[in-house]
Amino acid sequence: LAFFDESKNLKDRQINNIPIFGSFSRLIKLKQQFPDLEVWLAMPSIQTEKRRAIITKLEKIKVAVRTVPSFHELITDKKTMSDIQNLSLDDLLPRTRVERDVVDDSNDKNFLISGAGGSIGSEIVRQLLDSNPCSIILFDISEFNLFRVERECQAIISSKSLSTKIVPILGDIKDSKNLNFLFQQHKVDYVYHAAAYKHVPLVEDTNNIIKACENNVLGTLNLAKVSMENDVESFVMISTDKAVRPTNVMGASKRMAEILIQSLNTHASKTNFSMVRFGNVLNSSGSVIPLFIDQIAKGGPVTLTHKEVTRYFMTIPEASNLVLQASQMADGGEVFILDMGEQVKIYDLARKLIHLSG
């Protein structure tokens, strides 16, 4: 066990007889001496650029990197010292995370999130809870996902002493009768439509094309019409950059849904319709990151379609924050996108994950 710190004041000192090293070359020697060496980063408040520079150095010597909880998390009992975690996915992106404040005017509003149990839907719910809205309707077709997100919401509400009412609803966005009853009963003000079939290879299968289009196109149209009929203030549809000149069924179905939503916005309605296009969302269900992590945990191999393939990436919190911004910024019919910087090589992403996993 050893400490590393670049501060000159700590050079050659000890803490409880444990040496403090300040030279990176010493770390390289330790790696040679102990091949299974792990490095724990105890710098939760360090600037992003400096943190990324340190991680890049550690990546080159192929050590496993973990992070320890912040001092604030420890003293507030949110975490303990046993909560050692892998690196945040933010550390994999070659840019600073994009995050903008969303105006808090939702205390008396009622929200419905379709696909609330999914990776994007559940993060939208978490960010909404920061505003302590009147109610959040968790709408999902998956019983397990709905149970999981509802339980998490109740834990957040309890820990933060919030007054938000959580309403878990099992349902299908194609069921107009059920949706109308739900909207009238709960006086829905905002709809965030995250429910979709989005796994490209699965949707591309000839056995699944019809169901994918029914859900992504007709289901979206149905939910939008019910929202309009019930005077919902804002309807934000989550789309994809694959809807631009689509080359697959998933992208084409999303583009069709976009066109339908934009056509509804031209009608005399109190509902403001808008869309948000996502790039590849890190660690969302079906994305490459969970697949890579699983392959690494099993000892490999890590599989790629091609070494030169590049993609734009965004994190789940970034994607969800963009959805909330869209509902406040939209005048009607817009398509919002996030500036995701430069494209990232999938190969580089996989290599970084492998190196930082030791």
PLM regions and their residue ranges:
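Conserved Rossmann-fold NAD(P)-dependent oxidoreductase catalytic core, especially the SDR/UDP-sugar
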Residues: 76, 193, 197-258, 263-264
